[in-house]
Amino acid sequence: MIPRLLTEQVQRSAAWFPIVSVTGPRQSGKSTLVQHAFPDYAYLNLENPELRNQANVDPISFIRDRSTHLIIDEAQYAPDLFSMLQVVSDETKQPGQFILSGSQNFLLLRQIKQSLAGRAGVLKLLPLSYTEALAAQPELTIEEFMLTGGYPHLHDAHVPRSIFFESYVNSYIERDVADYLDVRNLTMFRTFLRLCAQHVGGLIKETTFANELGTTYRTVKSWMSILESSYITFSLPPYYGNLNKRLTKTPKLYFHDTGLLCHLLRINTVQDLQEHPLFGEIIENLVISETVKRYYNALKTPELYFYRDDSKIEVDLVDCTHSQTEPELIEIKSGRMYHDRFAKHLRSISTLLNVPDDNRTVATRVDRSYTDHDVNVRSIRDLLLQTEEPVA
C-alpha cells in the first residue's frame, strides 16, 4: 500500500466521533485506507449481495449481532442501516464505533445528513498527492504526474493509463451516473464530460455548454452538480472581499485529477502534454487541485478563490485558508523561467488587499525557489511538496 497522508487524521477522527465516514472519488483508495488504519475492526463490504441483503432486510440484527468496531464499505447500499447506526452510537456513546466508506458519495452523504448529523466525522480522500505518489515512484516528474494523475492503481499496479481511464470513465458513467443519478442520455453526458475538459480553467458558463450540447441550461446545471458531488470536478469561486470594484461573479472549472483530465483531452505522452494548447491551464489545475488535497489531508476546509475585475486584473489563486485579511496570492505560469512582468497583477491586487510582500508568489517550473525583490518565485515542484500542519 502507498502510505496516505490522511491515515493519521482518520484515526484521530475516530477518537472524536462515534462514526467516521471517508468519502472521495471512485478508486481513490478509500477501502484500502480504512482497512489499513483500523486493522482490528471487522470489515464488511456491502458489494457482497448476501451481506447487502442482510443489512437491508434486518438492519437491527446486522448491527446488534456484531462487534461495534465495524468497517462498513459501500454503506450507501443499505439506507435503512443508517438509522440503526444512529441508535447504537447514541446508546453506547463511544468514539470510533463505525467506519463508513462508499463509492457513491452523493448517496452516502445524503444518508449521513439525514440520520447521522453531528455524529459522523466526514473526511475526503482524493487521489494521491504528488508527495504521496513520490513514495511509490521517487523519480516521478511533475509533468509525468500531471499525465498519470493520482489514482493509486496507476502507481502500485502500473496499469496502462489508457486502459485504466477508459474503464474508469465507463464505470463512472454506467454505474454512478446511469444507475443512481437517473441520467438518461449517457452519450450526451460523455460528450459533456469531454467538453468540461476542453474548458478547464475557464469560467463556468452553463448557457454556452447547453448551446454546444443542444440541451437545456437546467440539464447542464444538474450535470455540473453531478460531477462535483462525485469528485470529478470542482469549482473555484471568485474573490469578493470588501472591494469597491466590479468583479467577476462566475466560478472557474477544474478537475480533481489531471490524469483523468489529460485522458479526456486525448493527451497520451508528456510531449503531447507540453505541446498541448491547454498546457498552461493543466498546470494551473495541477497547482490548485494539489492545494485542495493538501488542506483536506490536514482536515482543513480550503478557502480558495481567484481574482478578476473589470480592469482585466487577474490572479489565479487567492488562498484565504490561513487568513481572510492577509490572503496568499499565487500566480501560476507554465514556463521554466521567471519574468518580472508575471508579478504585475500580484502587486496591483496586493495594494488593493493590503497583502504583505511575503504573501505574493509566482509559481513556475524554475529549478529552484528564490525571492525576487517583493515576490516569492516558487518552483512548482516545491509548492506541490509543501506540507500543512493538521488541525490540532
Where are these regions (language model features)?
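Domain-level recognition of nuclease-like catalytic cores that cleave nucleotide substrates
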Residues: P127, Q137, R365-A392
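Accessory nucleic acid-recognition modules appended to NTPase machines
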Residues: V159, I163-P327
